[in-house]
């Protein structure tokens, strides 16, 4: 997931450098969405690991 966020971030930087602001805004928006999804999934797994980890040991 973070791989795709980085790919869209690089694409948005290239598009911004070339002056295609519409493409840059769209790819930056997609990269932000993917980043936030990855953070939410990380937090869910962190909470699950803390909850289940205590039960296992």
Curated annotation (Swiss-Prot):
Pfam families: DUF1328. Its main location: membrane. It is found in: Cell membrane. It is a multi-pass membrane protein. The chain crosses the membrane at residues 4-24, 33-53. Coiled coil: none annotated. The keyword Kinase does not apply. One of its GO terms (cellular component) is plasma membrane. The keyword Cell membrane applies. Keywords: Cell membrane, Membrane, Plasmid, Transmembrane, Transmembrane helix. Signal peptide: none annotated. It comes from the Bacteria. Belongs to the UPF0391 family. NCBIfam families: PRK13682.1-1, PRK13682.2-5. This is UPF0391 membrane protein Smed_4051. It comes from Sinorhizobium medicae (strain WSM419) (Ensifer medicae).
């Amino acid at each position: 997931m973070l791989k795709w966020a980085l790919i869209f971030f690089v694409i948005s930087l290239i598009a911004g450098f070339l002056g295609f602001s519409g493409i840059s805004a769209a790819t930056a928006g997609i990269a932000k969405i993917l980043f936030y999804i990855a953070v939410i999934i990380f937090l869910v797994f962190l909470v699950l690991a803390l909850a289940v980890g205590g039960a296992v040991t």
